Each structure stands twice: as structure tokens, then as C-alpha cells.
């Protein structure tokens, strides 16, 4: 049975007619030519197109389905791109992309050399600000609004669209605190797209607060009308002000987060009533900002499988839209995330001090099973990476041994806390850093390329890079024995398929493992010092070149004995890592060799000094010079 929604009440058009309507819109200027009563039909056409298109490319589906009417209404009412829209995170921006001239390009969404899955300034003038990480939109829109005010452009609107999940990020609250300073001086509109979801289910007291909000709009409107009537009569106006002070708690609805920042709040209103949205937004344009409009939407709206399971359809691969995502056959290999999940559950059975923390990435970080089995030793702190790390530091001070499960790209957001609250105090916090290295379709904002460089520079920090499935278990066990800060970084997806034979065994801290030893003659002797995934990627190269291959295991402490031995016994050293070359593991090797007075020629392979775009991971590895063919050629050239 076709799972696409047929219940929405819109003017009856055939699928071909809806398609024709959508194809007539190549910009918001075209959109504004439609009669407002046609907009529900357009919403249906957009959803049909999104489901068909994303089912072929993969992408963030359920969030964009939920924000369809919102995207239509914003571009219909506001003069984009002169008026600027900032889409927080960007998961919900596909309708925006389609309406702003990228309908045909959606076939290349997140593909190599295709359009980005997120708003990107270099891609379109309608993408006012690049987003992909959470909670940045209000700060960015506020900055633009202040700049325009300084430049005399006081008629330009700046709109931040932020979800209820993203509003739990501290940066968003900081921006609200700042925005309230401007009272009514700026044309700043904050749309709270409230769909009761982030990626994982919502967490924290703020989510509960949003769920209970009632509208202050009627009271606010009544107050403004009363002002206009009473102010011309001084005696009545003075009396009204005295009465207001005594009755405000009686007449006003419960205080909201926004009113506490002196920001006018309206809502909640139905985010799927597109004609109502248009009318409301037109009225708001007559006011000065900052203004918050609270819009209630349903994540996955219009496609029943996504409505029923918005988390499953948050980020999807290719699927059949007629039947929806179907259970796949049991995988032959476990992902590194699944291996981490197995390890943390097994370890928690043995060690009652283990406490798991995630900043709103329960599913992605592999903690679903842990939460089921150990709910009292688990906390999703919402989109609050900084708090997650310092919360872990506090636990560690009081005899609990915390594990912070976090993506590499999101660990960047908590760097000061890692330095100030964990490393300086030498606290036993284990960072399980998922998505380390190139992640593919999510692109430059989500690759985990900087963690080696920014972690190895910290005193007291141990940095570990498992190379395969069994090493993952061994090195997590080893990390758990430390009573100091430690980070274990591992890539997205699966490894080479090595059987996991380790149970509770550990390895010596700072000791590497020699995978093979060269028998090449002097002058042709190469030692490859590989970190993490580069070990199995270069196994065949080492065999073809008859090179020594060392699984370094530890970036810090570096196995200095192994490095000295390799330098003394080989004509060429090669380091390889799936991370930024500047300041990375190869740099650590060269720093040590320099201090030791060793001058053996060394080639460093890592990610070059550029931000890597989205695309197929293997293509990106090749473009970064990390594919076996390129590395082998460079080694052979160095030996010749």
C-alpha cells in the first residue's frame, strides 16, 4: 500500500497537475504569483517531490516534511533573499532549497559534487548563513540584523528558524539574552519550529517548559490596544498603570522563557495551516522585533511512515517510498558504533561506577541498549556539549567513572571544557569519539578531522586510534583502566571485518603492534606507521612494497621506541592518518624525531589544509590523497 498522505484537504489535482505546479516555481518570486488558496496544493506537491527525491539520494527527510508549510509561508510573505532566513541546523530546509531554484539539483543532494544537505552560502543567495550544527541561528540572524541597523538598512527582516531541540543548546539561550537588549529596534523574527523532537526524543526541563507554553499574544494585543485608548487621557493612563502592577499576575498567562528576555512571544499556532501562517506572518511584519513566533508542527508530516517513526526517517538512505524503509538483512559486520554499544553494556555489568552521557545523540552514539539496561546510569543532556563534558567532570570528582559518547565534530563545541574542566584537573573521563575521520554525505561541517590535533596537544590526555573491530574492544578495555583523561576515536561505519576475540584483555599503554616486517634490501626499506583505519587500508600496499607496517594504536603517548627503531632500520618513514595533517599524528612523529636528532626521510599522509566537501567517502579519500594507489605512488617516487 502506498504510504504517502492522501488525507490533507487541498484542492483536488492529479499528481501530474501538482508536479506541473511545482515545476512552474523556480524562485520565491514565482511562488508569490500563486493565489494564497493554492498554497496547500503546493505543500502537497512539495512533499510528494521530497519523498520521491530523497528516497533516491538519502538525506534528512522527516524534519523537512514537517517544515514544508513554514518554508512556503516565509518565502511567500518575506522578500527573500533581501530578507534573510537562517535555518538552524538545516535538517528542515529541503522545501526551502526546492523553492529557491534547486529543485532539479535535488537529484544530486549530498552526492559527490552535488548540492549540500545543509544551507550553504556559496550555493545560493537564499542561504543567508551556513548551518549544520545546532543552536546557531539566533546569534547569526541577530548579528545580521545589528549590522543592517548600523548600515542604515532598517527595513530588512532577519528570520531565525530554530527547532525545539536546538533551543536546548546554551548558545541559543545566550542569543535570546542578547536579543532582548534591543527591545523593538530590530526587525528580528525567531520562528520556534516545535515538533517535539530533536534527533533523539527531547530531553531536559526546557523541553517540558515548551510543551506547557500558552500564548501570550491575546494579552499582549489587548495591552497594546488599551495603551492606545488610555494614553491620551492622563488620569486614566496613570490609574491603568497602577492597576496593571497589582493585577499583572492575575491577568497575564504564565511567564515564558521569551518574555523573561523582553522578547514578544506569539503562539503556539498551527504550522501546517499554510494560509493561516501567511496571514499571521503578514500581521507580524507590521510590528518591530525581536519577536518569537511559536509554530507547532509534526515531524514527518504527510508521509505516514515518517509520521509514525520520525527518528527512523530523520536521516535515511535510499528506500522505496511506496512501502517505506524495510528491515534489512542482518549485517555481516558490526559497525564501530555497535561495537562500542556492546562494550559499554558489558563493562557496565562489571563496573557499577560507569555512567554514560550523550548530548542528544542516543541512537547515533549507540546508547539505546545502554539506556534500556542501565537507565539510572545514563543521561541524555540534550544539545549541550559543553555541559555534557563538565557534568562528566563533576561526576569524576565524586567517584563515578563517566563515558562521554560524542561525535568528533561535536566534541569541537566543548573544547574549553575538555581543557579547563577535565584535562587540567586530570580527571578520569573517557571520551568515546564516534565519526572520527571522513563521514561522507554530511560533508565539511560533520567530518571528524580535527580531534587528533586538538586533543594530542593537551597535557594529561591519552589519544587512542583502534584499527579494526578486535582492536576496538582491546583499546576500549585499555582506556577504561586509566584514571586520567582518555579519548578513543573511531570511524563511522564498519571496519575490515576482523573477528572480535578480546573480552576483557588490555594492552600496554603507549605500545604499538607490528603487523608485518620488511625483508627488502637496504635503500628500499620502508616503514609505514599507520594510525586507526589507515592500518587496514594500507595492508596491501605494505605487502606489495615489502614494507614494515606498524599499527601505532596510540597517538599519545607515542610509542617512541617503535618510532626510533623504524627510523634506524629503514630508509623511508611513512605516517598515515584519517585526520588533518597539520598538528596531527604525523606531526607528533616528526616532533619526536627532531628532538631525538633523527633525520630519516619522512612522508606524512593526512587530510590537507582545506575543508573537505560532501560525497562518497572513498572518493573523498582519493581526493585527499589517502587512497592506496596514491600513497603507493608517492612512496615509490620517494624511493626512486
What are these regions (language model features)?
Residues 49, 73, 323-330, 334:
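Nucleotide/pyrophosphate-binding catalytic subdomain
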Amino acid at each position: 500500500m502506498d504510504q504517502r498522505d492522501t488525507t490533507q484537504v487541498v484542492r483536488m489535482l492529479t499528481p501530474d497537475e501538482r508536479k506541473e505546479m511545482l515545476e512552474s516555481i523556480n524562485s520565491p518570486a514565482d511562488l508569490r504569483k500563486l493565489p494564497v488558496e493554492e498554497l496547500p496544493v503546493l505543500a502537497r506537491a512539495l512533499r510528494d517531490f521530497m519523498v520521491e527525491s530523497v528516497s533516491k539520494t538519502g538525506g534528512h527527510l522527516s524534519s523537512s516534511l514537517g517544515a514544508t508549510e513554514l518554508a512556503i509561508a516565509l518565502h511567500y510573505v518575506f522578500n527573500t533573499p533581501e530578507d534573510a532566513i537562517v535555518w538552524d541546523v538545516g535538517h528542515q530546509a529541503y522545501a526551502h532549497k526546492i523553492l529557491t531554484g534547486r529543485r532539479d539539483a535535488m537529484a544530486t543532494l549530498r552526492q559527490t559534487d552535488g548540492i549540500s544537505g545543509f544551507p550553504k552560502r556559496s550555493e545560493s543567495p537564499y542561504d543567508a548563513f551556513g548551518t549544520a550544527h545546532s543552536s546557531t541561528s539566533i546569534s547569526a540572524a541577530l548579528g545580521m540584523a545589528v549590522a543592517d541597523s548600523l548600515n542604515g538598512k532598517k527595513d530588512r527582516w532577519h528570520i531565525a528558524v530554530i527547532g525545539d531541540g536546538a533551543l536546548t543548546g546554551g548558545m541559543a539561550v545566550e542569543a535570546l539574552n542578547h536579543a532582548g537588549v534591543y527591545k523593538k529596534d530590530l526587525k528580528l523574527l525567531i520562528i520556534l519550529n516545535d515538533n517535539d523532537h530533536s534527533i533523539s526524543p527531547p530531553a531536559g526541563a526546557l523541553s517540558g517548559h515548551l510543551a506547557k507554553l500558552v500564548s501570550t499574544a491575546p494579552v499582549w494585543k489587548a495591552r497594546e490596544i488599551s495603551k492606545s485608548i488610555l494614553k491620551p487621557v492622563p488620569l486614566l493612563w496613570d490609574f491603568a498603570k497602577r492597576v496593571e502592577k497589582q493585577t499583572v499576575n492575575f491577568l497575564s498567562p504564565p511567564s515564558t522563557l521569551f518574555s523573561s528576555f523582553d522578547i514578544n512571544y506569539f503562539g503556539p499556532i498551527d504550522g501546517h495551516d499554510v494560509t493561516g501562517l501567511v496571514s499571521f506572518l503578514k500581521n507580524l511584519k507590521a510590528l518591530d522585533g525581536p519577536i518569537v513566533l511559536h509554530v507547532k508542527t509534526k515531524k514527518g508530516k504527510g508521509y505516514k511512515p515518517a509520521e509514525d517513526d520520525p527518528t527512523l526517517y530523520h536521516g535515511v538512505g535510499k528506500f522505496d517510498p511506496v512501502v517505506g524503509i524495510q528491515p534489512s538483512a542482518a549485517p555481516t559486520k558490526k559497525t564501530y558504533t555497535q561495537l562500542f554499544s556492546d562494550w559499554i553494556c558489558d563493562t557496565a555489568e562489571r563496573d557499577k561506577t560507569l555512567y554514560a552521557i550523550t548530548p542528544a545523540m542516543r541512537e547515533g552514539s549507540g546508547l539505546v541498549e545502554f539506556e534500556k539496561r542501565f537507565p539510572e546510569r545514563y543521561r541524555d543532556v540534550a544539545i549541550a556539549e559543553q555541559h555534557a563534558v563538565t557534568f562528566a567532570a563533576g561526576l569524576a570528582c565524586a567517584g563515578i567513572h563517566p563515558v562521554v559518547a560524542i561525535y568528533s565534530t561535536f566534541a569541537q563545541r566543548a573544547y574549553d571544557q575538555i581543557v579547563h574542566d577535565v584535562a587540567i584537573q586530570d580527571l578520569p573521563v573517557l571520551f568515546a569519539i564516534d565519526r572520527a575521520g571522513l563521514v561522507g554525505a554530511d560533508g565539511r561541517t560533520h567530518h571528524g578531522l580535527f580531534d587528533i590535533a586538538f586533543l594530542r596537544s593537551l597535557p594529561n590526555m591519552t589519544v587512542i586510534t583502534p584499527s579494526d573491530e578486535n582492536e576496538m574492544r582491546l583499546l576500549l578495555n585499555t582506556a577504561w583502566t586509566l584514571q586520567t583523561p582518555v579519548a578513543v576515536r573511531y570511524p563511522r561505519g564498519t571496519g575490515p571485518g576482523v573477528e572480535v576475540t578480546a573480552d576483557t584483555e588490555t594492552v600496554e599503554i603507549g605500545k604499538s603492534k607490528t603487523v608485518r616486517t620488511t625483508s627488502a634490501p637496504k635503500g628500499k626499506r620502508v616503514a609505514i606507521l599507520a594510525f586507526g583505519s589507515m592500518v587496514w587500508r594500507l595492508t596491501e600496499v605494505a605487502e606489495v612494497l615489502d614494507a614494515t607496517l606498524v599499527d601505532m594504536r596510540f597517538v599519545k603517548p607515542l610509542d617512541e621506541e617503535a618510532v626510533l627503531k623504524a627510523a634506524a632500520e629503514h630508509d623511508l618513514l611513512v605516517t598515515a592518518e584519517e585526520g588533518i595533517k597539520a598538528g596531527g599524528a604525523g606531526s607528533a612523529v616528526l616532533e619526536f624525531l627532531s628532538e631525538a636528532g633523527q633525520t630519516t626521510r619522512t612522508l606524512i599522509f593526512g587530510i590537507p589544509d582545506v575543508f573537505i566537501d560532501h560525497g562518497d567517502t572513498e572518493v573523498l579519500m582519493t581526493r585527499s590523497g589517502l587512497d592506496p594507489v596514491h600513497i603507493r605512488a608517492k612512496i615509490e617516487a620517494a624511493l626512486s
